Curated annotation (Swiss-Prot):
Induction: Up regulated by iron deficiency in roots and leaves, as well as by nickel, high zinc or high copper treatments. Repressed by heat treatment, high iron, low copper and low zinc treatments. It holds the Pfam family HLH. It comes from Arabidopsis thaliana. This is Transcription factor bHLH100. The lineage of its organism: Eukaryota, Viridiplantae, Streptophyta, Embryophyta, Tracheophyta. Transmembrane segments: none annotated.
Length: 242
């Protein structure tokens, strides 16, 4: 009965052959034996080659340099505006201002600062005159019997250096001493100094006070040389200074 059962895989009349050929692992002589292409190029090498190609392009390099310069320029501008905001009054520093708002607030604040500087300079002049007048009056009272002592302190001059090219000069003299203040101004201007401003006042102690804001055109102000020059100008008018 078993012999009548047909095989599971019929050969349809073809010989089955040797099955040992398919059971072996040696397929070196088959049609599958062909060389594979070399695909070992890495991503890094490709990227490096692309970057080298871009850097060799003058248009790309110009664009990269422009972008770098623009970033640096914006960084400097932001730093300058940040410094400008820090100079504004505290009420304007509570919130971050835009560029246009910062410039607007600065333009409004500059005249206020200029007015404050004028008031402070005026106050300084008044204090300097008061101190100089008190010192001279005390010396005059103590030496009222000595005419030479009174004469030697009849007039005084002092200078305050404001900057490398500017100086404030204060002159104190007795009203009884006759000297032309215009002669002093003329002599100073002949020496290359520019008169920025001048003022005068009178105290209760019979003294006159003059203030001159001078600026030199070329070079720096030398306080000692300026004092000697004023001393010479006043000596021409019959004054002596200490």
């Amino acid at each position: 009965m078993c012999a009548l059962v047909p095989p599971l895989y019929p050969n349809f009349g073809w010989p089955c052959g040797d099955h040992s050929f398919y059971e072996t692992d040696d397929v070196s002589n088959t049609f599958l034996d062909f060389p594979l292409p070399d695909l070992t190029v890495t991503h890094e090498n490709v990227s490096s080659e692309n970057n080298r190609t871009l850097l060799d392009n003058p248009v790309v390099m110009k664009k990269l340099n422009h972008n770098a310069s623009e970033r640096e320029r914006r960084k400097k501008i932001n730093t300058m505006f940040s410094s400008l905001r820090s100079c504004l009054p505290p009420t304007n520093q509570t919130k971050k201002l835009s560029v246009s708002a910062t410039v607007s607030q600065a333009l409004k604040y500059i005249p206020e600062l200029q007015e404050q500087v004028k008031k402070l300079m005026k106050k300084k002049e008044e204090l300097s005159f008061q101190i100089s007048g008190q010192r001279d009056l005390v010396y005059t009272d103590q030496n009222s019997k000595s005419e030479e002592g009174v004469t030697s302190y009849a007039s005084t001059v002092s200078s305050t250096r404001l900057s490398e090219t500017e100086v404030m000069v204060q002159i104190s003299s007795l009203q009884t001493e006759k000297c032309s203040f215009g002669n002093v101004l003329s002599g100073v201007e002949e020496d290359g100094l520019v008169l920025v401003g001048a003022s005068s006042s009178r105290s209760h102690g019979e003294r006159l006070f003059y203030s001159m804001h001078l600026q030199i055109k070329n070079g720096q102000v030398n306080s000692e040389e300026l004092g000697d020059r004023l001393l010479y100008l006043y000596e021409k008018c019959g004054h002596s200074f200490t």
